[in-house]
């Protein structure tokens, strides 16, 4: 979902280079230097307004987190929260998920989250889906062997597409849930803003957890 431009977004981003990087091509292999100490490194691609990644950083102080978001207005909303919270294990990136191998080195990421990505339902836009094979190839390159990819969506079509895409890519599924909020196997779900609204209206949430075969 596109957010309206916010006049305060760019000045806020420019004022906090210690918390946010813009298209960080020179950070490959050096991400731990952005945190107060080295910890396992987790990446969310498409962080939206940031409720999920902020809560994860608060809940798991033993991990480092990176929130990557393409929209300036959205990442600025996360930055507003981080300016107030000053979480030592959270860094923000204004950048494109299509450029991950420019931002991260091979095997640098311990886990990756895709939450409520744009479904791009038209066939001609298939290559823009974050579970298209070209994206999967980048995830595989930057993730450690057996690192987990967690994917959540409310869009049944995108979920089914993602299952097929990942299966064709040779991934192994650790969890497939057709109704996440009623799945007793999942006890540690952290919802996004959108997820809370959608499920409160009776919507169904789909989730899969998978890893690459090496």
Curated annotation (Swiss-Prot):
Enzyme Commission identifier(s): 2.1.1.33
One GO molecular-function entry: tRNA (guanine(46)-N7)-methyltransferase activity
Keywords: Methyltransferase, S-adenosyl-L-methionine, Transferase, tRNA processing
InterPro entries, alphabetized: SAM-dependent_MTases_sf, tRNA_(Gua-N-7)_MeTrfase_Trmb, tRNA_methyltr_TrmB_bact
Classification via Pfam families: Methyltransf_4 (PF02390)
Pathway of action: tRNA modification; N(7)-methylguanine-tRNA biosynthesis
Keyword Ribonucleoprotein: no
Annotated signal peptide: none
Residues given in the record as substrate binding sites: 122, 154, 192-195
Stretches the record annotates as Interaction with RNA: 124-129
GO cellular component entries: tRNA methyltransferase complex
UniProt-annotated binding residues for S-adenosyl-L-methionine: 44, 69, 96, 118
Catalytic reactions of this protein: guanosine(46) in tRNA + S-adenosyl-L-methionine = N(7)-methylguanosine(46) in tRNA + S-adenosyl-L-homocysteine
Active site feature: 118
Family: Belongs to the class I-like SAM-binding methyltransferase superfamily. TrmB family.
Biological function: Catalyzes the formation of N(7)-methylguanine at position 46 (m7G46) in tRNA.
Name used for this protein in its record: tRNA (guanine-N(7)-)-methyltransferase
Native source species: Lacticaseibacillus paracasei (strain ATCC 334 / BCRC 17002 / CCUG 31169 / CIP 107868 / KCTC 3260 / NRRL B-441) (Lactobacillus paracasei)
Classification lineage: Bacteria, Bacillati, Bacillota, Bacilli, Lactobacillales
Gene encoding the protein: trmB
């Amino acid at each position: 979902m596109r957010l309206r431009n916010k006049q305060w977004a760019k000045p806020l981003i420019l004022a906090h280079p210690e918390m946010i990087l813009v298209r960080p091509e020179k950070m490959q292999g050096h991400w731990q230097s952005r945190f107060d100490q080295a910890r396992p490194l987790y990446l969310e691609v498409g962080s939206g307004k940031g409720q999920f990644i902020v809560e994860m950083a608060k809940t798991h102080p033993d991990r480092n987190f990176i929130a990557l978001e393409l929209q300036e207005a959205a990442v600025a909303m996360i930055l507003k929260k981080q300016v107030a919270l000053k979480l030592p294990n959270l860094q923000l990136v204004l950048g494109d998920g299509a450029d991950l191998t420019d931002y991260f080195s091979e095997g640098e990421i311990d886990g990756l989250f895709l939450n409520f990505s744009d479904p791009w339902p038209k066939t001609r836009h298939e290559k823009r889906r974050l579970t298209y094979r070209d994206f999967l190839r980048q995830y595989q390159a930057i993730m450690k062997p057996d690192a987990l990819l967690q994917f959540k969506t409310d869009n049944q079509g995108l979920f089914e597409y993602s299952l097929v895409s990942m299966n064709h890519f040779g991934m192994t599924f650790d969890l497939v849930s057709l109704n996440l909020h009623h799945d007793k196997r999942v006890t540690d779900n952290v919802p996004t803003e959108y997820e809370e609204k959608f499920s409160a209206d009776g919507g169904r949430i789909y989730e899969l957890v998978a890893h690459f075969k090496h």
